Swiss-Prot record:
GO terms for cellular component: cytosolic large ribosomal subunit. The gene is rplF. This is Large ribosomal subunit protein uL6. GO terms for biological process: cytoplasmic translation. Belongs to the universal ribosomal protein uL6 family.
Amino acid sequence: MSRIGNRVITVPSNVSVNQTKELLTVKGPLGQLDLKLKEGSKIKVNVENNEIRLTRGDELKQTKMLHGTYNALIKNALEGVTVGFKKELRLVGVGYRASLKDNVLNLQLGYSHPINLDIPKDLKVTVDKNTEITVSGIDKQKVGEFAIQIRKWRMPEPYKGKGVLYLNEQIIRKAGKTAEGKK
């Protein structure tokens, strides 16, 4: 039994939640998010008295999985439109730099060419000190996906600790090869 799905979600006073057939619209001070519910799912969403309750119509494995997932997605949407989400990255390495021009993030990560990433329209990206990047927005999934898209260009490596790291991330360092030659 999904315990996460049975939790009651309280809606903040400055957020409005509207439900149509298979679409849940969450509006708040930071924006609006639309959650598409799977067609034919037996999950019922009840919005009343600033509370959201999810109930499932049957005990099939698929329905049980969606029960907890929908609860988490709705909770993330409520948090996103009130507080927002952000991921902070830092560039560690000689010559690693980032800059913003118009709606393009320019990264120099030791390759022979710069990397230009188009910033999605619903995300906000800021660059501080040329080595710190902050990705923020109301959709938790999109913020995380764009942060990973930046990070995949130079994943942190364990020998020198260089790469694109999340803020406060610690890389477990490995010892390099030791000279084994003459005895």
